[in-house]
Regions:
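ABC ATPase NBD coupling module
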Residues: 16-21, 73-95, 195
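The feature captures the beta-strand-to-loop junction immediately N-terminal to the Walker
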Residues: 40-42
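Helix-to-loop junction immediately C-terminal to a conserved catalytic motif
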Residues: 55
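Short coil-to-helix segment of the ABC ATPase nucleotide-binding domain corresponding to the Q-loop/switch region
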Residues: 107-115
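Conserved signature/switch motifs of ABC ATPase nucleotide-binding domains
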Residues: 143, 164, 196
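Conserved ABC ATPase signature
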Residues: 144-148, 152-154
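Catalytic Walker B motif of ABC-type/P-loop ATPase nucleotide-binding domains
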Residues: 169-172
């Protein structure tokens, strides 16, 4: 399938103690519908920075990010958008899952999923309940985050990411706080999303996560060491295991 999200020549640098540090150096990345793509590399390699840029959370210093428009209208060059249009595109086309869940502690699981809904008033709760059912939490909808396990909280976060039916799901270390059983459940859900035609991008240190991907890209010192199109997960798993042990 075609790329639903694409970075071209993306560069990013920061100033640290008076010195310029290049975090990303002209990176190209295509995240395709129907695939789970893993982005791997050691700490400081630029993985999360790239996720934030391609997720329209942080602007690049150079290069461009393209997001597939609605109804097959073709890729949108996000560098040409106003801040408001950029925010609208991000909310409607991209869904985010983070390691720390980022759930509001004073609200129920259901309310956490409903809050970002962009549709008609009155439709949000039904949509949220359906998504909680999909992730196996229909009976936990009225529970507070503190009453849920880590794995359950992450599934609430995934349901929230899907509430506006985005074609792209981005996840930063989504299994970092989970036990093996919860990890397997979450990875199964990501696979289902890709099988529906969505594009799924996972940033990870975890060999089990990269092994579950279709394509793996490896970052090192701000550049890809793998081919531009990535490599099949089975060819990359051994390298990820080595990195995790370092």
């Amino acid at each position: 399938m075609s790329a639903l999200l694409r970075a071209e020549g993306v560069g990013k640098s920061y100033t640290l103690r008076g010195r310029r540090v290049d975090v990303l150096c002209g990176v190209d990345l295509a995240v395709r519908g129907g695939e789970v793509t893993a982005l791997v590399g050691h700490s400081g390699s630029g993985k999360t920075t790239l996720l934030h840029i391609i997720g329209l959370l942080t602007p690049p210093d150079s290069g461009r990010v393209f997001v597939e428009g609605t109804d097959g209208t073709g890729p949108v060059d996000t560098s040409e958008l106003s801040d408001g249009a950029l925010a609208d595109l991000r909310r409607s086309r991209l869904g985010f899952v983070f390691q720390s869940y980022n759930l509001l502690p004073q609200h129920s699981a259901l309310r956490n999923v409903v809050l970002p809904f962009l549709g008609r008033r009155g439709e949000g709760e039904a949509r949220a309940r359906a998504l909680l059912g999909r992730v196996g939490l229909a009976e936990r909808a009225d529970h507070l985050p503190s009453e849920l396990s880590g794995g359950e909280q992450q599934r609430v976060a995934l349901a929230r990411a899907l509430v506006n039916d985005p074609p792209v799901v981005l996840a930063d270390e989504p299994t970092g706080n989970l036990d093996t059983e919860s990890e397997e459940v979450l990875l199964g859900l990501f696979r289902e999303l890709a099988d529906e035609g969505r594009a799924v991008l996972l940033v990870t240190h975890n060999p089990a996560v990269s092994d579950a991907a279709d394509v793996v890209h490896r970052l090192d010192k701000g550049a890809f060491t793998s081919p531009a199109e990535g490599v099949p997960a089975e060819n990359a798993a051994e390298r990820v295991e080595t990195e995790s042990a370092e």
